[in-house]
């Protein structure tokens, strides 16, 4: 057996580390363990196994003075070696694990270098993923640097920050100016009291809601009385025809309360207030007005005075009270 082994392994068995062969287990008298321990002759499968080992050792090419030997095969084939890793030189498999790295400088009695055989190689356990080639190490460092660069925010200069603040201030001023212009337009369409200071936005919205509700109720109440003809809407101080000329139509008039038409009285809640400038929306049948005297009644919407917390919008029926500027 020694002759056969030396024929395939010129360097002898000394080149194998203790992790592959144990001297006590290899040379034993118990024939029940391994047929290689007999020493008389090798069986056919044992000879094939030795040839496979020799072929595998020569298959591991030695590059840059270092090579990678994988872990030994399962116990069923203790002397077989797995094929080389696809990870490249000095790189462990993706699955991790402790392979065997080998380097030059085998102990005396190792494999002599020859053109047909690899240089001497000393196997030792690798540290798994910790054993990386310089190329893999460089790739890892470059990836970490790129990730850090992506996370790093660009530091703006003081001039850039000042420009950003100025742009934000300009946008805010324009936004507030547009809101103020919209409220001014709303105030111009709502009959309000002559107040010594401009109405706030809350008061403007409250008056607008009350005025819109009043006009909506008035239109709903006038639907059964209106004719089929189209009418118009009077502007400030004027009136327009909204109903048809049917004989059964009733004269309707909308009067925005005009203060000061009645004699002032100290008991009047509106005493001392200047007259309210408003507009009148009126429509009636002109023929009926010419033929007979008609008593006109109308709903009156009085705007809420912001100075009076307890006052609310009121709806009154005023009889024979002329509007602010009545146009018959």
From Swiss-Prot:
Q: Start and end of every bHLH domain? A: 163-215
Recorded hits in SMART domains, A to Z, give: HLH
Q: Note whether Cytoplasm occurs among the keywords.
A: yes
Q: Where are the transmembrane segments?
A: none
Which cysteine pairs are joined by S-S bonds?
none
Question: Record's GO cellular component, any one?
Answer: nucleus
InterPro entries named among the record's database cross-references: bHLH_dom, E-box_TF_Regulators, HLH_DNA-bd_sf
Instruction: Give the highest taxon in the source lineage.
Output: Eukaryota
This protein's UniProt keywords: Cytoplasm, Developmental protein, Diabetes mellitus, Differentiation, DNA-binding, Neurogenesis, Nucleus, Transcription, Transcription regulation
Where is it localised?
Nucleus; Cytoplasm
Look up keyword Nucleotidyltransferase and say if it applies.
no
- GO BP term, example: neuron fate commitment
Connected disease = Pancreatic and cerebellar agenesis: A disease characterized by neonatal diabetes mellitus, cerebellar agenesis or hypoplasia, severe intrauterine growth retardation, the presence of very little subcutaneous fat, and dysmorphic facial features.
Q: Tell me, how does this one assemble?
A: Component of the pancreas transcription factor 1 complex (PTF1) which is composed of TCF3/p75, TCF12/p64 and PTF1A/p48. TCF3 is responsible for the nuclear import of the p48/p64 complex. Interacts with TCF3 and RBPSUH/RBP-Jkappa.
In its miscellaneous comment, the UniProt entry states: An excellent marker of acinar cell differentiation in the pancreas.
Name of the protein described by the UniProt record: Pancreas transcription factor 1 subunit alpha
Query: What is the organism of origin for this protein?
Result: Homo sapiens
Query: Which gene name belongs to this protein?
Result: PTF1A
């Amino acid at each position: 057996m020694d002759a056969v082994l030396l024929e395939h392994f010129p360097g002898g068995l000394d080149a194998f580390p203790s992790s592959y062969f144990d001297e006590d287990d290899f040379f034993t008298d118990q024939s029940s363990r391994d047929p290689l321990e007999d020493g008389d002759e090798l069986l056919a499968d044992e000879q094939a196994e030795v040839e496979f080992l020799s072929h595998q050792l020569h298959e591991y090419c030695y590059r840059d003075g270092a090579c990678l030997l994988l872990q030994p095969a399962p116990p069923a084939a203790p002397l077989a070696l797995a094929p080389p890793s696809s990870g490249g030189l000095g790189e462990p498999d993706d699955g991790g694990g402790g392979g065997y790295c080998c380097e030059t400088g085998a102990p005396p009695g190792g494999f002599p270098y020859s053109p047909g055989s690899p240089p001497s190689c000393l196997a030792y356990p690798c540290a798994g993923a910790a054993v990386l080639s310089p190329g893999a190490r460089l790739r890892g460092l470059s990836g970490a640097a790129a990730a850090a660069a992506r996370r790093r925010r660009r530091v703006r200069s003081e001039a850039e920050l000042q420009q950003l603040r100025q742009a934000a201030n300009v946008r805010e001023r324009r936004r507030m100016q547009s809101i103020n212009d919209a409220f001014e337009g709303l105030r111009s369409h709502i009959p309000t009291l002559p107040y010594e200071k401009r109405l706030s936005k809350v008061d403007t919205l409250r008056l607008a809601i009350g005025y819109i509700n009043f006009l909506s109720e008035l239109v709903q109440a006038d639907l059964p009385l209106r004719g089929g003809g189209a009418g118009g809407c009077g502007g400030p101080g004027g009136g327009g025809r909204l109903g048809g000329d049917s004989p059964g139509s009733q004269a309707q008039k909308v009067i925005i309360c005009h203060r000061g038409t009645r004699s002032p009285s100290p008991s009047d809640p509106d005493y001392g207030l200047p007259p309210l400038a408003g507009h009148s929306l009126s429509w009636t049948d002109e023929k009926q007005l010419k033929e007979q005297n008609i008593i006109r009644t109308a709903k009156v919407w009085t705007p809420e005075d912001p100075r009076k917390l307890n006052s609310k919008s009121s709806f009154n029926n005023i009889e024979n009270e002329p509007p602010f500027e009545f146009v018959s």
